[in-house]
Swiss-Prot record:
Gene: pnp
Cross-referenced HAMAP family: PNPase
Name used for this protein in its record: Polyribonucleotide nucleotidyltransferase
Major location category of this protein: cytoplasm
EC number, UniProt record: 2.7.7.8
Lineage: Bacteria, Pseudomonadati, Pseudomonadota, Gammaproteobacteria, Pseudomonadales
Family: Belongs to the polyribonucleotide nucleotidyltransferase family.
Enzyme class: transferase
Native source organism of the sequence: Pseudomonas fluorescens (strain ATCC BAA-477 / NRRL B-23932 / Pf-5)
């Protein structure tokens, strides 16, 4: 073994790249260690044979966190890692997005990237180490790849400015959590959430990260110079263009294709383009000496691509007739589902989201078992994309990677505007059902989520809206598009999603398919996005401008109270018997914290209030000079014990029964009898002294 090791400084951290010691049968393998904090093993394997029948580049990225990395044993019956967690799925997507555009066009060999977290101190997120390792493993693998890439996480504090690769603790106090990846020349991917930062601050963070991760790219190049395998014998040049075929299609069908792209209804447009494609295939393939049907279809697609892009950069109307800055018509409704806690139907052109907010108790929070330990998440946002939303039949089942990713983006967009847990201690679940889709369904989910939460009475700090921007760049000409359609996303060069309030940005996601995106283009895109966001917020505010002052009648009632910590065991009871009895009898749920904070949730106000009274009864202290209605529990020779509060009995001495002389207590009282008693005293041992004979005088004096 002759391992090759490269060390470099990355911000405050020392990063070590090592290859040649572990996983030597992979095409490329790198162990990335950041200080003594995180170690990630990244392997890349490329199939030697192409699979052109797939019709897409078969790249798969698998990020996995092993529990042994944090010195833990997995839970569950089998005691081993199972299906990928949401965090693992999202990180896999984060790594996939910047590397996918850097493989050559037409490359159809399967490539699999596996990133395994093998050691962590749980202080920082291992995702940046995994991205650096992926860049390095690809660079030394010999697989055709136009890298390397660098990656960095950026935080922001008003007082100290931008911070490179923050710890979890530093992120908690930050106004920004942004991951940026790209090549030496260009930014390729941005994923972020923020607390209402300005567009300039967001752009500054992107440029800061790009400058900082140049050290990563330099180190990877140095590693590759020493340890890279021979580059595959792959023809990087694209297949020779079928000039004659393209010319024939354009000559005979070019005008018809151009006209088809003026049909504004997506289904009608697709139907017309399908007819034209069939006509082209029938006319130009099938006979001996003619191109194959697949070649003709590919050429037809190229004509479509060029037609749409040429129209846009030359200033012609877009597919649906809009100019570059106009948002599609909006239709907004709230309270559309009578039995839900909050609901909204948000329609933008041919994209529609039915969004529902549900409030639950603290026990409904999602339990997350992470490398950092178990924690509860009181906010969930789930995004569903059924096949009928695009007029197709398809698989129904659990959420895929795309749905998980879109749901997380929508969650990031609204999370900063949610109230603090001590102000609004409900668990919140938002579900976005995409019922129609023609571009930017994730941003429709953001708008719908904000509306549904306000409809449910969740005290949002401010309404949130989102917009998707696109880009078409041909040479020096470019056009930034507001509110892109599905076709514009597919045929364009950039997907740029921005969400925020009227005050600032709360989420930014960017994926770029080409090189040469300049600071100027990003600045224009952010400016147009702000203009569109304010337009959408204005229309949303006309329907519901602030959260409802009362929760839905269908939502659970929550009562918060606090008791002395010494009383917690009294409320819980032996083996939980007391609290269990209260919950069963009142149909409410009770959560008690170690500091004595209690949250009572009831399906109705009456249930919650009944439980509160029971808790008050258990925790209340007898007040000297107060009259109580009590029940005689036990009679003794010298008096009677009367229960005045749950678990609290006081003694009425025989001399305190009546002004007249009493021979026997049973002459006055019997067990089970209800009587009014006055609290005379409570000694330092908690013993309560009661009187019956002084009740009348106390009442007369106004007690």
């Amino acid at each position: 073994m002759n391992p090759v090791i490269k060390k470099f400084q990355f911000g405050q951290s020392t990063v070590t790249l090592e290859t040649g010691r572990i996983a030597r049968q992979a095409s490329g393998a790198v162990l990335v260690t950041v200080d003594d904090d995180v170690s990630v093993l990244v392997t890349v394997v490329g199939a030697k044979q192409a699979d052109p029948g797939k019709g897409f580049f078969p790249l798969s990225v698998h990020y996995q966190e092993k529990t042994y990395a944090a010195g833990k044993i997995p839970g569950g019956f089998f005691k081993r890692e199972g299906r990928p967690s949401e965090k693992e799925t999202l990180t896999s997507r984060l790594i996939d997005r910047p590397i996918r555009p850097l493989f050559p066009e037409g490359f159809m060999n399967e490539v699999q990237v596996v990133c395994t977290v093998v050691s962590t101190s749980k202080k920082t997120d291992p995702d940046i180490a995994a991205m650096i390792g992926t860049s390095a493993a690809l660079a030394i693998s010999g697989i055709p790849f136009d890298g390397p890439i660098g990656a960095a996480r950026v935080a922001f504090h008003e007082s100290t400015g931008y911070l490179l690769n923050p710890t979890y603790e530093q992120l908690a106090a930050s106004s920004l959590d942004m991951v940026v990846a790209g090549t030496e020349e260009a930014v390729l991917m941005v994923e972020s959430e923020a607390k209402e930062l300005t567009e300039d601050q967001m752009l500054g963070a992107v440029l800061f990260a790009h400058d900082e991760f140049q050290s990563v790219i330099k180190a990877v190049k140095e590693l590759a110079a020493e340890a890279a395998k021979p580059t595959w014998d792959w023809d990087w040049a694209a297949a020779p263009e079928a000039t004659e075929l393209l010319g024939a299609i354009r000559a005979e069908f070019g005008e018809a294709i151009s006209q088809a792209y003026t049909i504004t209804v997506k289904a009608d447009r697709y139907a017309r383009l399908g007819e034209l494609k069939d006509q082209v295939v029938a006319k130009l393939s099938g006979e001996e000496g003619q191109p194959s049907a697949s070649d003709v279809k590919a050429a037809f697609g190229e004509i479509e691509y060029r037609t749409v892009r040429e129209n846009i950069v030359n200033g012609k109307p877009r597919i649906d007739g809009r100019d570059t800055r106009t948002v599609r018509p909006l239709n907004i409704e709230v309270g559309v589902l009578p039995k839900t806690h909050g609901s909204a139907l948000f329609t933008r052109g041919e994209t529609q989201a039915l969004v529902v907010a549900t409030l639950g108790t603290a026990r409904d929070a999602q339990l997350l078992d992470t490398l950092e330990g178990e924690k509860k998440d009181p906010f969930m946002l789930h995004y569903n994309f059924p096949p009928f939303s695009v007029g197709e039949c398809g698989r129904m089942g659990g959420a895929g990677r795309r749905e998980i990713g879109h749901g997380r983006l929508a969650r990031r967009s609204v999370q900063a505007m949610l109230p603090a847990a001590d102000v609004f201690p409900y668990t919140i679940r938002v579900v976005s059902e995409i019922t129609e889709s023609n571009g930017s369904s994730s941003m429709a989910s953001v708008c719908g989520a904000s509306l549904a939460l306000m409809d449910a009475g969740v005290p949002m700090k401010a309404p949130v809206a989102g917009i998707a921007m696109g880009l078409v760049k041909e040479g020096e000409k470019f056009a930034v598009l507001t509110d892109i359609l599905g076709d514009e996303d597919h045929l364009g060069d950039m997907d740029f999603k921005v969400a925020g309030t009227a005050k600032g940005v709360t989420a930014l996601q960017m994926d770029i398919k080409i090189k040469g995106i300049t600071e100027e283009i990003m600045e224009i895109a952010l400016g147009q996005a702000l203009e569109a966001r304010l337009n959408i917020l204005g229309q949303m505010n006309q329907i519901i401008g602030q959260s409802r002052t009362e929760l839905s009648a269908n939502a659970p009632t929550m009562i918060a109270m606090k008791i002395d910590t010494d009383k917690i065991r009294d409320v819980i009871g032996k083996g939980g018997a007391t609290i269990r009895a209260i919950c069963e009898e009142t149909k409410a749920s009770i959560d008690i914290e170690d500091d004595g904070s209690i949250k009572i949730f009831g399906e109705t106000k009456e249930a919650a209030e009944a439980a509160r009274q029971r808790v008050l009864g258990i925790t209340a202290e007898a007040e000297i000079g107060k009259i109580y209605v009590g029940k005689v529990e036990r009679i003794v020779d010298f008096g009677a014990f009367v229960n005045i509060l749950p678990g609290k009995d006081g003694l009425v001495h025989i001399s305190m029964l009546s002004d007249a002389r009493v021979e026997k207590v049973t002459d006055i009282l019997k067990e089970g009898q209800e009587v009014e008693v006055l609290v005379l005293d409570v000694d330092n041992r908690g013993r309560i002294k009661l009187s019956i004979k002084d009740v009348a005088a106390a009442k007369a004096s106004g007690v």
